[in-house]
Curated annotation (Swiss-Prot):
Gene that encodes it: MAGEC3
Gene3D superfamilies named among the record's database cross-references: MAGE homology domain, winged helix WH1 motif, MAGE homology domain, winged helix WH2 motif
UniProt-listed GO biological process terms: negative regulation of transcription by RNA polymerase II
Tissue-wise expression: Expressed in testis. Not expressed in other normal tissues, but is expressed in tumors of different histological origins.
GO cellular component, one term: nucleus
Lineage: Eukaryota, Metazoa, Chordata, Craniata, Vertebrata
Disulfide bond sites: none
Keywords: Phosphoprotein, Repeat, Tumor antigen
Keyword Phosphoprotein: yes
Skewed-composition ranges (Basic and acidic residues): 354-363
Protein's name according to its UniProt entry: Melanoma-associated antigen C3
PANTHER family reported for this sequence: MELANOMA-ASSOCIATED ANTIGEN C3, MELANOMA-ASSOCIATED ANTIGEN MAGE ANTIGEN
Biased composition regions of type Pro residues, renumbered to the chain: 383-414
Amino acid sequence: MLLPCHWVLDATFSDGSLGQWVKNTCATYALSPVVLPPQPQPRKKATDKDYSAFHLGHLREVRLFLRGGTSDQRMDSLVLCPTYFKLWRTLSGSPGLQLSDLHFGSQPEGKFSLRRAVSVKQREEPQDWPLNEKRTLWKDSDLPTWRRGTGYTLSLPAVSPGKRLWGEKAGSLPESEPLFTYTLDEKVDKLVQFLLLKYQAKEPLTRAEMQMNVINTYTGYFPMIFRKAREFIEILFGISLTEVDPDHFYVFVNTLDLTCEGSLSDEQGMPQNRLLILILSVIFIKGNCASEEVIWEVLNAIGPWSALAGFADVLSRLALWESEGPEAFCEESGLRSAEGSVLDLANPQGLAGHRQEDGRRGLTEASPQQKKGGEDEDMPAAGMPPLPQSPPEIPPQGPPKISPQGPPQSPPQSPLDSCSSPLLWTRLDEESSSEEEDTATWHALPESESLPRYALDEKVAELVQFLLLKYQTKEPVTKAEMLTTVIKKYKDYFPMIFGKAHEFIELIFGIALTDMDPDNHSYFFEDTLDLTYEGSLIDDQGMPKNCLLILILSMIFIKGSCVPEEVIWEVLSAIGPIQRPAREVLEFLSKLSSIIPSAFPSWYMDALKDMEDRAQAIIDTTDDATAMASASPSVMSTNFCPE
């Protein structure tokens, strides 16, 4: 059995010479620790002939404190855990430790070799420990916890901050001798984030930027950290860094010619190829045939999930609020109610149900259900519409004027208009194009990447909460109130936050904000959906309920127009259902995902068929009414004709 010990080594260096080592040993087991008391000796230059070898056993942890030769100020500390050490003893009996390639400034301090540990019996006899012919200790059978063979040599990294590491040249570090794993991983992770921010901003980068913003004091390890980060973004995102200047000037190049949402517009945003690569890799590993359960098991490990599932989760929680009350809602969603009646939507996860708590940084991806019909377009992976990859733009005079117009309503009930269904979709596409042309004339905000995404989500959630409170109290809201109460120090991002919050409450609750005083930016609320629901029958507005209706219709529509009646009535028991055409549901989903309706081919055809059926019913009704009207005079003439 080996004796695990905790060693604290306090070293003193002076002019490149080994000084006195002071060691205190405490055993972690019940066995007596080995104590090597320091022996006083005059300082002299270290040479190999001044030392004879002895070995220490298995160490649980070694903490090495490094001090200046003429000062008691501690430079740094190095923790090694666990490993095997070879210690040296001078001819006078004073113990010393040799470290390999450990440079402070340009002064090497000797060699550090790893050897197999010794047994407890040998530990009890620290003097003249025997070595075999190969100058290694004991047999493998006597060392159950040591499996590295006859011997191993490893170099330790430099830890002194503010000094050149690993000799005179910063690039002289062998890449096979890394930092501690957690430090290396942390630096690689930070560099990956920095590279992605540069990619989103469409900016080149230099080695000096990476060293100054990420690498910091670990400049000697830059080649290793940069290589790992470069491989990571190339494998996962399909982005390659190409050096275009001998002075380490790099630009981003897409290595995969893939069609995805990010490549359909000039806005690069966060690369989305990684999800496709991941799914294709899983399919390839499984022999070109992977079940949906296997795919989702992999996707659940990294975060993306169905957009419609997230949307349904949000609205079902709101249904719980309406039917069961605030207490049941808060208990279900893990939120708290403020003052017993006000919904606390400051938690973005409770509001939108779309952000998981893993902290990495959240990229939203599409789910397999969103690929229905063989199309490549993606839908947002959250209940709330996804935040833009680049910030929206605003006109010079302030935030964009909010139109009270909501989703497109039913066409005029005439046979001609009802039959021209393709024109409806063309009109919807034209409206979308006109909106894009209008936004092209706005001025750009500071890039959203400079504001952390989680902070942006939180501000949007807080503003939605504030707007809903104002809606419940039937009070108008001003820009000054929003800036003072919610936005606070993020005033530069007000147009972006306000735009997302307004879009959210309009899509989910059917509430539009109309600017009734452009000078003071005073807004009032207006219902955009011409729907009959409980809240419109009384003077009390309360929490808007349109979202519940849209939820149920969406559920029926998504399930292929076939859902068990028990499931529907279980949800609708407290609110009262109303039928809406499939076209309006499809328009709503299209607006929510910013995709044209024809991107959902099967649902699109169903909606067209539904419209044709409705149009035919109107025609039949009109024909019947005409026939009855034409038949009426003849009947009357028969009744009143003279005998």
